[in-house]
Design a protein with these regions (language model features):
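A short helix/loop element that forms part of the nucleotide-sugar donor recognition site in Leloir-type
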Residues: 170-183
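A short, well-ordered alpha-helix in the C-terminal region of glycosyltransferases
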Residues: 329, 336, 343-357, 373
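Short alpha-helical donor nucleotide-sugar binding micro-motif in glycosyltransferases
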Residues: 262, 270-275
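Short hydrophobic beta-strand element within catalytic cores of glycosyltransferases
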Residues: 300-303, 313
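A short, active-site helix/loop in glycosyltransferases that binds the activated sugar's phosphate group
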Residues: 13-14, 18, 118, 126-156, ...
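A conserved catalytic-core segment of Leloir-type glycosyltransferases
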Residues: 2-69, 392
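Conserved acidic donor-binding segment of nucleotide-sugar-dependent glycosyltransferases
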Residues: 315-316, 320-327, 336-341
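Aromatic "clamp/platform" in nucleotide-sugar-dependent glycosyltransferases that forms part
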Residues: 283
Length: 393
């Protein structure tokens, strides 16, 4: 929007009392809440039932407002399917899509049936691959997964990682940040941020903390592990939250680990800055936005060596890699950073510098290049192609 591009962001209305059109993203960008199914939060798999209604609502809004769009950029497979519906009405508008996560990858790491992606998601993702003119992937690993798991050989993919707001996520005086979020200023803070689901590996973190308490009891006397995500006070908390809370009791780490539920985005920078360590023990991450936000805050990350985390976190340079589902190795790495101040501070400084590469201004330029190439007139595309083709002779 800051480059003079008018942007309309469509989302499904979840509250009838929220204005249909919001200017909250700033000049040149609108958030438009359209009715598609009940105006309330729904389980993600139920949203699939209202994709057609969502697409129709977008089409009707554009017609009523007399708006024409040059390009559609969709995120997640459900929005990609909506774009497929719009393609029937707007056949000449190119579609750019970003999956963020892939159902078949989630299925490969699932350990229970309830973690599996539904069949309609797998079919939907395959369809979106066919629909899209360009597929944005966060890392080369995600590109390889599309080829390997979905048989995609279309060469539609372009690697453009997500960006981070370096003004919002930045190093802050740690004691002041701890005081702001209510962590004792002399405690060492370990932080997890994410959805409370088996895929995120919170159980591995709990097991690792129990090992540290057993082996190095003095090291955890002033340690606070904060779990951000979910709703631990819900009248009927979900199965994973119940399982993790029970595990905390069984492992005897109630005094160390605190579940504090979801937090407002504007509060997260203080939690990152307050933490000595951010832990991401995920079994699968297409990128790892939490890791990038932590790194921008100058906080080292210990992450599973999976998916995008294997690219984002550089082992021994700005954080540590550990194998997925390995509480022993995770415990040793956490302990190392708890007791080695110079190592922790070095990794934190390097993390902030590495995060600068992902500044939103840089990422926006890369995305604009993708848009410009798609919108280039056909004759210019052919001319550009001929200039860039190497002569095999």
């Amino acid at each position: 929007a800051r480059r003079g591009i008018q942007i309309d962001v469509f989302t499904r209305s979840q509250d009838p009392y929220i204005p249909m059109i919001s200017q909250g993203l700033g000049y040149g960008a609108r958030v438009i809440h359209v009715k598609a199914g009940p105006e309330q939060p729904l389980p993600i798999n139920d949203v699939y039932l209202y994709v057609d209604e969502f697409a129709q609502a977008i089409y009707e809004f554009a017609a009523e407002e007399n708006v024409t769009y040059d390009l559609i950029h969709t995120h997640y497979w459900l929005s990609g399917l909506a774009a497929g519906q719009l393609r029937e009405k707007w056949p000449s508008i190119p579609i750019v899509h970003m999956f963020h996560t892939l159902g078949r990858m989630k299925n490969r790491v699932a350990t229970t049936d309830r973690e599996l992606a539904p069949p309609e998601r797998i079919e939907g993702e395959q369809k979106v691959i066919e629909i899209a003119d360009r597929i944005v992937v966060a890392t080369p690993a995600e590109q390889a997964q599309l080829h390997w798991l979905y048989g995609n050989r279309s060469k539609k993919e372009v690697v453009v990682p997500p960006g981070v707001d370096l003004d919002k996520f930045k190093p802050l005086p740690r004691e002041a940040a701890k005081a702001h979020v209510g962590i004792p200023v002399h405690d060492r803070s370990i932080l997890f941020v994410g959805r409370i689901e088996p895929l995120k590996g919170v159980d591995t973190l709990l097991q690792a903390m129990a090992l540290i308490q057993e082996r190095y009891p003095s090291a955890v006397k002033k340690v606070t592990v904060t779990i951000i995500g979910g709703d631990p006070w819900a009248h009927d908390p979900d199965l994973e939250m119940k399982r993790l809370q029970a595990m905390r009791e069984q492992l005897g780490i109630r005094d160390i680990v605190t579940f504090i539920g979801a937090r407002d985005q504007n509060e997260l920078p203080y939690y990152y800055a307050a933490a000595e360590i951010v832990v991401m023990p995920s079994h699968y991450e297409s990128f790892g936005m939490v890791a990038l936000e932590a790194m921008a805050s100058g906080t080292p990350v210990i992450a599973s060596e999976v998916g995008g985390l294997a690219f984002l976190v550089q082992d021994g340079e700005n954080g540590f890699h550990v194998p997925s589902r390995d509480p022993e190795t995770l415990a040793e790495r956490i302990y190392e950073l708890l007791v080695n101040d110079s190592c922790r501070e070095r990794l934190g400084r390097n993390a902030r510098e590495h995060a600068r590469k992902y500044a939103w201004s840089n990422i926006a330029e890369k995305m604009l290049e993708v848009y410009d190439k798609l919108l280039m007139p056909a004759e210019e595309k052919e001319s550009s192609r001929s200039r860039h083709v190497e002569n095999p002779l």
